[in-house]
């Protein structure tokens, strides 16, 4: 596709007058994102991303604004779109646009605009220079470049991918032989999956449902579909609010973990009729189907905290009961099924970003510090990598964790030489073998 089909648009946001509000929130978030701020201080003179043109497709939130400005502080040029139609915080997008950064994002995109916004990030400035790095969340940007703009691939040094779903897409490409550049899997860094996915969801899942519904969660029967890291955090979130939580699972290991964590583990069909809230966390498709909707009681709340909107069969719901749909407020809709009202949050998309503001700044600093280190590594050392999916090395995973300890008042013990020799590690780490499971 010719670059002439994408004329230069400096930015597109909902309301640029929100910039001052967004800037205040960004400054507040910076105080809670010690990893990113430490990288700015460490690399400000070295400028390790100088010359990089990073196209990013990741939720355009206040926390993401801190990531964007970190990449720029390290020398990069950046363009940005959001990876979800509902996840943009308009004040964050406005603040980034007001800072002279090309951002194309607003809350409530339709599918056509969503695609348009991603496309705008492929070329930089009035000179329309093409991207040479990708920072993705879910794989939509990556797929657009590879499938629709293959002529740009040769100039791209690599990509980093944020989330479970996007990583799955990358491994599918490796298997099919269609991944044309090296990729770093951010999601499975310990300091991402065991923190963002678990502790982030532990705080943001309940926050979203409360904001959307004003329900008293204590005593409510909640079904959490899936018990991976996201499911673990989500189940803990509702348990902490006093809910009675049941888990569904396909994996015997995760099911055993859930049972030993004190949750009942049941088939969805056996518990759905009594559920007050159902939340999907699996990253798979077709978890809540038409047959399940028909079993739900009046006023059941249904939502999803996986990346895409295909865990809940919204197509069936809209085809068969769309005429009954009533918008209660943005991202909260009521459908009537056989005389019973079913409440759908965020149209089945990410509830914590559709109905709230996502994970707290501190835990996102973990994830985004990983992203920044991955971009530095691929930009400077791409020749060392094949067109495969890689993990950040353990010493960098440990570095990300270490950068966040002082904020929490954590003090580390230090190994003596004889102790390090005894367990076969260096005094300064890494402290665990690659096969260690945290």
From Swiss-Prot:
Function: May play a key role in the regulation of the intracellular concentration of adenosylhomocysteine.
Needed co-factor(s): NAD(+)
Segment forming the signal sequence: none
EC number from the UniProt entry: 3.13.2.1
Gene name, Swiss-Prot/TrEMBL: ahcY
GO CC annotation terms, alphabetical: cytosol
MF terms in GO: adenosylhomocysteinase activity
Pfam families per the UniProt record, alphabetical: AdoHcyase (PF05221), AdoHcyase_NAD (PF00670)
PANTHER family associated with the record: ADENOSYLHOMOCYSTEINASE (PTHR23420:SF0)
Cofactor note: Binds 1 NAD(+) per subunit.
Keywords tagged on the record: Cytoplasm, Hydrolase, NAD, One-carbon metabolism
Record-level GO BP terms: L-homocysteine biosynthetic process; one-carbon metabolic process; S-adenosylmethionine cycle
Main location, first listed in the record: cytoplasm
Protein's UniProt name: Adenosylhomocysteinase
Localization in the cell: Cytoplasm
Pathway: Amino-acid biosynthesis; L-homocysteine biosynthesis; L-homocysteine from S-adenosyl-L-homocysteine: step 1/1
Family membership: Belongs to the adenosylhomocysteinase family.
Catalytic activity: S-adenosyl-L-homocysteine + H2O = L-homocysteine + adenosine
CDD domains to which the protein is assigned, alphabetical: SAHH (cd00401)
Primary enzyme class: hydrolase
Binding site for substrate: 61, 137, 162, 192, 196
PROSITE patterns, A to Z: ADOHCYASE_1, ADOHCYASE_2
Cited InterPro entries: Adenosylhomocyst_ase-like_sf, Adenosylhomocysteinase-like, Ado_hCys_hydrolase_NAD-bd, NAD(P)-bd_dom_sf, S-Ado-L-homoCys_hydrolase_CS
